[in-house]
């Protein structure tokens, strides 16, 4: 094909010429002609040519078929691959060029090609006459379709008939008329301020600035609803509020200047609408810099907006977050001064409850459930208290939405009672099949088979009854959901009729169909309430406070649900649970347990951690073990303990590891070890082990954690410690505690000495913020005996995994306690003694294969005070004489 300059054409016109080559090749024709180009134009996705022809009264199908027939009759050449420009197409391009010059356009567009087609002597004029289309009619249609935004085809992408606002915008007022927008509750001051700015003569462009989720977009939707209701000044009545979709505006803009031309066309349509259009740009910061990479930094979208904004030709509402406004808009003072700031603050809990009450019917209709007022209040209060990284009302609305979705899923799924029953039935049927299939054993199992048959019959009757009840309840709830949806639709129709002043239709709907639906719904609700009164319901239809608390607990890992009876008993007996692992240290155990009970009963200070403790005492007395036991008791897992060995934070710069490196340093994006751990697991036990070894600057960081329950990490995020237990351990003053020995009378004097040593090392403002400073006393021999039992239980569990039982006599346990007792080092020498005196010999016996599965290892003390081991074989059904007992003697292990 001969070269043709693509710079003479708009993008769509050139795309049609390029695509015409594909059409010609499919027809195996070497000569590119008019029919190929027109077929390509009719096939374009944008449909500009088809739209122009349709407006001119030509059915596209009536034109396509004759074109295809004519093209198939042209000569074919299967061997040729080179395409040539036909004489007819060359003539068409000349005619299109004349039309361009006549209309004073810069590029040849689709409309110019169509004008050339109807004047084409070869095929176009003949087909056009058959369809009653002439050049004059087509020209009139094209001029009528020319968008105000594109009087000339001055850019490569622009097509005069393109409906830019409908393609790149969303009419909020039309959605408000159709009742498709959620009701906007409150925000009267902000909406009034927006209306006030829009009513100005110049710079009439408000920008809504607020945190994500506070309701900036909802304010624009509220304005659209007020425009539809006529509750606005005359300057805004009958106006259209169009939300600009920046995503679709930018998407696919691959050619030079394409994005800018799209935006310019949209802005021209708005400015030439005689003030009928108000533009809403959500995420306004995306406009600044958009498109700058295509034609240089001077040609971004923000610079296209500035002149129109300053002159008042364009009324535009922007919305962006506080951070993005600071990062983008404020850096361009010329753009910033053209917008008037309207700050949108987070609503209070009371305002959020009012917003949720306004949205309640929409969510009930969507999910087909009922939402109690208590659930709405719980959503506002619990989200405000426990979800600190998001903002009201968005997080409260999300709680209601997810809790409703969860309940709807439960309604459509089988109840847990029915599933448990079916599993039990399956288990019994498998057992029955197994016992019946054993040859010759049927008589042996006859009693059990009879029991299974009786139980199966009972369970099957129960299953049939529950199935019937479930289907009945499910049908009632589904019918209730359907009626709620219909009621919501009717309400929308009533509102629309009232807006249109169609009082007859409104009264007919409101007092006829709507009342009938409400009576049906009330009857079904009474049936459901009757089932509830009998206490026989399998399904729930109401979202309650407990559902909201469950969602909050799932999101945050903070237990905010109502206490179950099992957990209530566990909390009341928390000291005994902790004492199963921590021997002695009653004061510390009682203080920690009391703090946990206060928190779960809702009596703690909401702005401080659950508890902050400083454990003091010599090594090995249970300071770290108590923190581990607490984590295990609360979370049933020791790995729930967030532990920091403060000996790793002895340098000044190591504090950045806790809250994150400052900007400009490596690791800034990764966050801090402490801040990230608490952000992901806010309900945790945080242990700062051997806190006195840390650099003094670390304690400055801990001040706000202990007092306000919060810190700010390197990225400016607030980390909430209000649901954490802070435990710090230290060996400061342990020498004074060791001097005390077992004399109770010297406790006060020792405590004074220890506190004096604390004051010398820690500053008063740090010590004053700790809830309780607890002294751990040295372990006595009696307490060490109890620790022996705990340590041996661990060893018994390890051996039980190898089918070996371990029996330690009381004398052997006392012997271990004596050998492991050291008041200076606490319980750690005992652990080493057990390792040396029991674990090492047992490991050797296992490797020597002295044990079989089911054997028992007995540990006792001989006459010389040394431990001895004996392997006991399991007793079999065969009676063996005592003299033949195969006992294995093991030499005593010296100390």
Swiss-Prot record:
InterPro entries according to UniProt: AAA+_ATPase, ATPase_AAA_core, Chaperonin_ClpB, Clp_ATPase_C, Clp_N_dom_sf, Clp_R_dom, ClpA/B, ClpA/B_CS1
GO cellular component terms listed in the entry, alphabetical order: cytoplasm
Binding-site residues, ATP 1: 210-217
Coiled-coil spans in chain: 397-533
Principal location class: cytoplasm
Region (Linker): 347-557
Tree of life domain: Bacteria
Annotated PANTHER family: ATP-DEPENDENT CLP PROTEASE, HEAT SHOCK PROTEIN 104
Role: Part of a stress-induced multi-chaperone system, it is involved in the recovery of the cell from heat-induced damage, in cooperation with DnaK, DnaJ and GrpE. Acts before DnaK, in the processing of protein aggregates. Protein binding stimulates the ATPase activity; ATP hydrolysis unfolds the denatured protein aggregates, which probably helps expose new hydrophobic binding sites on the surface of ClpB-bound aggregates, contributing to the solubilization and refolding of denatured protein aggregates by DnaK.
Additional facts recorded: Not induced by heat shock or other stresses, it is expressed constitutively in the cell.
Family: Belongs to the ClpA/ClpB family.
Record text about domains: The Clp repeat (R) domain probably functions as a substrate-discriminating domain, recruiting aggregated proteins to the ClpB hexamer and/or stabilizing bound proteins. The NBD2 domain is responsible for oligomerization, whereas the NBD1 domain stabilizes the hexamer probably in an ATP-dependent manner. The movement of the coiled-coil domain is essential for ClpB ability to rescue proteins from an aggregated state, probably by pulling apart large aggregated proteins, which are bound between the coiled-coils motifs of adjacent ClpB subunits in the functional hexamer.
Protein name stated in the entry: Chaperone protein ClpB 2
Gene: clpB2
């Amino acid at each position: 094909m001969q070269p043709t300059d693509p710079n003479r054409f708009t993008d769509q016109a050139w795309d049609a010429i390029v695509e015409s080559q594909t059409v010609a090749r499919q027809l195996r024709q070497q000569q590119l002609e008019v029919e190929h180009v027109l077929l390509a134009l009719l096939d374009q996705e944008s449909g500009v040519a088809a739209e122009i022809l349709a407006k001119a009264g030509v059915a596209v199908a009536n034109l396509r078929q004759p074109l295809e027939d004519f093209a198939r009759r042209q000569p074919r050449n299967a061997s040729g691959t080179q395409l040539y420009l036909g004489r007819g197409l060359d003539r068409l391009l000349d005619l299109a060029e004349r039309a361009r010059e006549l209309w004073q356009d810069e590029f040849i567009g689709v409309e110019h090609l169509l004008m050339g087609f109807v004047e084409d002597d070869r095929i176009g004029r003949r087909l056009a006459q058959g369809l009653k289309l002439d050049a004059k009619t087509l020209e009139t249609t094209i001029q009528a379709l020319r968008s105000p935004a594109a009087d000339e085809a001055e850019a490569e992408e622009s097509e005069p008939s393109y409906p830019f606002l409908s393609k790149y915008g969303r009419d909020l007022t039309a959605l408000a008329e159709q009742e498709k927008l959620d009701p906007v509750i409150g925000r009267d001051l902000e909406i009034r301020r927006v209306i006030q700015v829009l009513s100005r003569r110049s710079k009439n462009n408000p920008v809504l600035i607020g945190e994500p989720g506070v309701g900036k977009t909802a304010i624009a939707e509220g304005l659209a609803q007020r425009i539809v209701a006529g509750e606005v000044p005359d300057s805004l009545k009958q106006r259209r509020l169009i939300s600009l979709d920046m995503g679709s505006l930018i998407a696919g803009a691959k050619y030079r200047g394409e994005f800018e031309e799209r935006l310019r066309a949209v802005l021209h349509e708005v400015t030439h609408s005689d003030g009928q259009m108000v533009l809403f740009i959500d995420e306004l910061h995306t406009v600044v810099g958009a498109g700058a990479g295509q034609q240089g930094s001077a040609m971004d979208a923000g610079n296209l907006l500035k002149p129109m904004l300053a002159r008042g030709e364009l009324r535009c509402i922007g919305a962006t977050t506080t951070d993005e406004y600071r990062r983008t808009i404020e850096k361009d003072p010329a753009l910033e001064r053209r917008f008037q700031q309207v700050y949108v603050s987070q609503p209070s809990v009371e305002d959020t409850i009012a917003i949720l009450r306004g949205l309640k019917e929409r969510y009930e209709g969507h999910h087909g459930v009922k939402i109690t007022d208590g659930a709405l209040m719980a959503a506002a209060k619990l989200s405000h208290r426990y979800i600190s990284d998001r903002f009201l009302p968005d997080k409260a609305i999300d709680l209601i939405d997810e809790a409703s979705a969860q309940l709807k899923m439960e309604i459509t799924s089988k109840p847990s009672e029915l599933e448990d029953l079916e599993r039990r039935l399956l288990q019994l049927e498998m057992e029955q099949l197994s016992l019946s299939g054993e040859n010759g054993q049927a008589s042996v199992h006859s009693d059990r088979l009879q029991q299974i048959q009786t139980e199966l019959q009972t369970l099957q009757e129960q299953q049939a009854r529950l199935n019937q009840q479930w289907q009945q309840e499910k049908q009632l709830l589904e019918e209730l959901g359907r009626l709620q949806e219909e009621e919501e639709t009717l309400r929308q129709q009533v509102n629309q009729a009232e807006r249109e002043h169609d009082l007859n239709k409104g009264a007919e709907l409101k007092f006829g169909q709507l009342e009938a639906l409400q009576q049906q719904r009330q009857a079904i609700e009474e049936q459901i309430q009757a089932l509830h009164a009998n206490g026989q319901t399998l399904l729930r239809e109401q979202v309650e406070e407990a559902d909201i608390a469950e969602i909050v607990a799932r999101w945050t890992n903070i237990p905010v649900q109502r206490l179950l009876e099992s957990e209530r008993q566990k909390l009341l007996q928390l000291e005994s649970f902790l004492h199963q692992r921590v021997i002695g240290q009653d004061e510390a155990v009682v203080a920690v347990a009391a703090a946990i009970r206060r928190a779960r009963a809702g009596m703690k200070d909401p702005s401080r951690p659950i508890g902050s403790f400083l454990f003091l005492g010599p090594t090995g007395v249970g300071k770290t073990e108590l923190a581990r036991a607490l984590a295990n008791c609360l979370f049933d897992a020791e790995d729930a303990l967030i532990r920091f060995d403060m000996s790793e934070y002895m340098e000044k710069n190591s504090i950045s590891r806790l809250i994150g490196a400052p900007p400009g340093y490596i690791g800034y994006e990764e966050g801090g070890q402490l801040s990230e751990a608490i952000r992901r697991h806010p309900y945790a036990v945080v242990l700062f082990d051997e806190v006195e070894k840390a650099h003094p600057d670390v304690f400055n960081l801990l001040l706000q954690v202990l007092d306000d329950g919060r810190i700010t990490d390197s990225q400016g995020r607030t980390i909430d410690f209000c649901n954490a237990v802070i435990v710090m351990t230290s060996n400061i003053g342990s020498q004074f505690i060791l001097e005390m020995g077992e004399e109770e009378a010297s406790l006060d004097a020792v405590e004074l000495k220890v506190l004096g040593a604390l004051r010398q090392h820690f500053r008063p403002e740090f010590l004053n913020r700790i809830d309780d400073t607890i002294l751990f006393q040295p372990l006595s021999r009696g307490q060490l005996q109890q620790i022996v039992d705990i340590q041996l239980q661990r060893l018994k569990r390890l051996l039980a995994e190898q089918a070996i039982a371990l029996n330690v006599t009381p004398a052997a346990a006392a012997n271990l306690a004596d050998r492991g007792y050291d008041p200076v080092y606490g319980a750690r020498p005992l652990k080493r003694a057990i390792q040396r005196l029991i674990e090492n010999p047992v490991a050797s016996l296992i490797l020597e294969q002295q044990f079989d599965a089911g054997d028992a290892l007995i540990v006792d003390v001989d006459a010389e005070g040394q431990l001895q081991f004996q392997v006991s074989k399991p007793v079999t059904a065969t009676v063996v004489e005592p003299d033949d007992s195969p006992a294995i003697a093991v030499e005593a292990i010296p100390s």
